Amino acid sequence: MKTLLCSESVEVLEALLRLIQVGVGGFGRSWTDIVDSSELWDAVAYVDINEEALKEAAAAHEMPKDRCFKDLESALASVEADAALIVVPPKVHMEIALQSLKAGLHVLIEKPLADTMENAKRIVSEADKRSLKLMVSQNYRFRRGARTVRRLIETGKVGNPSYAVVNFHKAPRFRGFRLRMDHPLLIDMAIHHFDTMRYIFNSDPSSIYCETWRPKWSWFKGDPCATVMIKMENGVRLTYVGSWVSLGWETTWDGDWRIECSEGGIHWNEKVKSKLRDSANEVTERFVPMPLEDRAYSLYEFAEAIRKDREPETSGQDNLKSLAMVFASLESAESGKSVSVNKYL
């Protein structure tokens, strides 16, 4: 019996949508749990080049051996599906996404959409050509905190936002490809915060200036730290400071947000608090209710987009703007100059 991940119910549809999950080891393993808990999706096949990861995921969720495959081509030839969930390293995103789309499957893909803007645009173009849904799982904006901050700004309670400072400090001990990246924080993590910025301020970026570095104690090959200054099209400015080798105090994965507005301010760090000008009192805001949250909401939004034949909130086309922020940051870090984000779109 599949159970919901949140106290509020969602509309349960009679027929589950069928999903092939490509990549079930590492982070993909946690996705198998979320898919298995969904009342909207049914995993009909697992695909992974790592035989041990495949066996472990199959054993955990009673996936029959004849529905476990080492390549997507074999899975497509053996099972019928509505969509593919892609949880593999970014360098093979385009290959797997194009293969899925050409087979007529809708695609939900982990961020980043692709390893280059050119490859990301190819995936978006293929989905558009075939009238299939392409969604990037930017799950950080699907959390109650982010939803609550945006609602608070939209109410006008604290006035118009002017600038924000976002701090992110973690020390994850990853294995695999992230350790070998030149810019692991920017490529694999900051896109979550960049996308959340676009969502919260309901605006797109215009220019970016970035510096990155590698502390002596870092266990990453590349630069795991960055400072990014962002100007949005609506005039809001942001300063983002991030680290994946923080040995002192850590933030949540969402980060610590301080937003200065014309009538007060907002502080989001687990809880969302507001404070009006000339007031000694701060108010803890009530979270926006959501039927599901995080990656469970990604699956819900993806299913809704397919069922209702509409674009998902974090469609591939929309996500190009978040991905462009990453590549503009990378260019700025290399050149030492401010970079226009639109040049990547």
Regions found by a protein language model. Give the residues of each.
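Active-site loop of classical SDR/Rossmann-like NAD(P)-dependent oxidoreductases
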Residues: 30, 49, 53, 288-299
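C-terminal helix-rich "cap/oligomerization" subdomain common to oxidoreductases
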Residues: 1, 5-16, 83-85, 121, ...
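Conserved SAM-binding strand-loop segment of SAM-dependent methyltransferases
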Residues: 65-72
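Beta-strand-loop-alpha-helix segment that lines the small-molecule cofactor/substrate pocket
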Residues: 78, 83, 89-141
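Predominantly a Rossmann-like dinucleotide-binding segment in NAD(P)-dependent oxidoreductases
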Residues: 27, 140-220, 336
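Contiguous beta-strand/loop segments that form the cofactor/metal-binding neighborhood of enzyme cores
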Residues: 188, 194-271, 298-310, 345
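N-terminal Rossmann-like dinucleotide-binding module
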Residues: 2-62
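Hydrophobic residues in well-ordered beta-strands that form the structural core
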Residues: 21, 109, 115, 134-136, ...
